[in-house]
């Protein structure tokens, strides 16, 4: 045991004596450390950029939800196209943004959510169905019978700038907003009551 202690003390003494030595090659040290520093910088950049993209997608969904909650007129295809364009403005660097706007209600006797109307813009996104809505019921708020709310869903694809072990993926956000100024929000192709879905 005493011998092991002496070896450890001798090693520590050599280490402390060597810490004041300044002999070395800066080029060799740079060659050894530069790849690690570049990898750390690239990884930090990618993860920061991913959080930024997620934040922008979430803010866009909340903004669209807020716009819809204040609307008291008919929602028309032109209005939805404008909201899709707004999403594009809010997410300028986004790749293939997609959006789905739905109005739904809660039916207490059947303990289920029902879609009143739904419309979507973007590739690969279709209108929401009752079955699909009830699949995400864990993300929906508790509501009284026949309460109406809007559901805005946004998707955007994200591909990392550098390969740091993070595969390309899609950000998806769901935002539920209660209507503020009207009891219901109707969708109409013509903008009139004749074909309104409420």
Predicted regions and their residues:
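Alpha-helical assembly-interface signal, strongest on the long, hydrophobic N-terminal helix that forms
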Residues: 1-89
């Amino acid at each position: 045991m005493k011998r092991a202690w002496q070896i450890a003390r001798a090693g520590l003494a050599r280490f402390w004596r060597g810490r004041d030595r300044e002999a070395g090659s800066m080029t060799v040290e740079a060659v050894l450390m530069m790849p690690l520093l570049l990898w750390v910088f690239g990884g930090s950049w990618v993860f920061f950029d991913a959080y930024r993209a997620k934040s922008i997608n979430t803010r866009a969904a909340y903004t669209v939800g807020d716009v819809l909650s204040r609307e008291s007129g008919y929602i028309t295809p032109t209005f939805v196209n404008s909201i899709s364009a707004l999403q594009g403005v809010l997410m300028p660097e986004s790749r293939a943004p997609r959006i789905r706007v739905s109005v739904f209600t809660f039916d207490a006797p059947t303990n289920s959510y029902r879609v009143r109307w739904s419309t979507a813009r973007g590739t690969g996104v279709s209108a929401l169905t009752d079955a699909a809505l009830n699949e995400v019921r864990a993300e929906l708020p508790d509501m009284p019978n026949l309460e109406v709310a809007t559901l805005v869903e946004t998707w955007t694809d994200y591909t990392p700038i550098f390969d740091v072990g993070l595969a390309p993926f899609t950000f998806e956000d769901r935002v539920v907003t209660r209507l503020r100024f009207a009891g219901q929000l109707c969708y109409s192709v013509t903008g009139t009551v004749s074909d309104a879905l409420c």
